[in-house]
């Protein structure tokens, strides 16, 4: 709160260093059963996880950011945490209506249909980390049950609803290797190729959709879609050169594609 009230907001920064959105961690993780759930965990009926803040404090944090020209990106994994974050964002917007706030939920893993639809209703950005499929598919149903698992990690549904989906690596918790993320997004398999048909395969993204998450989606989230995210005249020439055509290769081999060159602002910064 002190940080925001000192005037740090979305107007600060440069083309290479930009403030915002404000990260707020509201719960824990699915693996540790600390993601905050509406109901008790299926495999531990003694806990619903951990909510870092009560709703009053979370509301104060989100409203302070909203009122002072700062978007929020709320870490919320469990359905209880996601619902609380959405409720607080909705109140902040209702009390101080603004256009183009670009608030979002980070991870947004455990969802039902109502929560998925609220992403669109509230015009929230969904920050996803496809690499989580590698591990979480093996524990998801045990943690939350089969029914809730069906509507969780539903990235394709979010895209079809018209939600802006922003892909990220979750580095340093996970590797910065984005090829593994793209692989998991389009195959819904772990890095060992399991399951053969993909976990909840109806939620597989096309390679075009996955690439948009990690390019246009990220640019939009930082209010920079007019500067980056696509290769167009007048935009930064930020790009990589791959050793294989990602549009044509076997999708199961995406994780094995190498980066031959990195170009930033039209200048080669790395090459083999």
Sequence positions of predicted segments:
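Metal-coordinating catalytic core of metallo-dependent amide/deamination hydrolases
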Residues: 1-79, 83, 118-125, 130-131, ...
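His/Asp/Glu-enriched, well-ordered alpha-helical/loop segment
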Residues: 62-73, 80-103, 107-108, 113-117, ...
């Amino acid at each position: 709160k002190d940080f925001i009230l000192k005037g740090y907001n979305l107007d600060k920064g440069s083309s290479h260093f930009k403030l915002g959105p404000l990260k707020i961690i509201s719960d824990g993780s699915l693996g540790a059963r600390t993601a905050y759930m509406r109901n008790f965990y299926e495999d531990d009926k003694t806990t619903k996880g951990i909510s870092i803040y009560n709703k009053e404090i979370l509301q104060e944090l989100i409203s302070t950011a909203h009122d002072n020209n700062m978007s929020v990106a709320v870490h919320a994994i469990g359905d209880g945490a996601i619902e609380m974050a959405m409720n607080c964002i909705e109140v902040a917007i209702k009390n101080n209506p603004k256009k183009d706030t670009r608030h979002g939920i980070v991870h947004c893993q455990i969802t039902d249909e109502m929560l998925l639809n609220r992403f669109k209703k509230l015009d929230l950005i969904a920050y996803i980390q496809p690499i989580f499929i590698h591990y979480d598919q093996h524990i998801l149903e045990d943690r939350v049950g089969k029914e809730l698992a069906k509507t969780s990690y539903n990235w394709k549904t979010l895209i079809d609803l018209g939600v802006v989906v922003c892909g990220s690596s979750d580095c340093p918790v996970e590797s910065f290797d984005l090829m593994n993320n793209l692989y998991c997004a389009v195959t819904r398999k772990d890095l060992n190729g399991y399951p053969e048909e993909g976990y909840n395969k109806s939620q597989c993204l096309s390679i075009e959709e996955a690439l948009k998450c990690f390019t246009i989606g990220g640019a939009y989230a930082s209010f920079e879609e007019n500067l980056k995210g696509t290769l167009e005249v007048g935009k930064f020439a930020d790009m990589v050169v791959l050793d294989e055509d990602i549009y044509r290769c076997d999708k199961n081999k995406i994780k094995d594609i190498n980066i031959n060159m990195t170009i930033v602002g039209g200048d080669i910064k790395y090459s083999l």
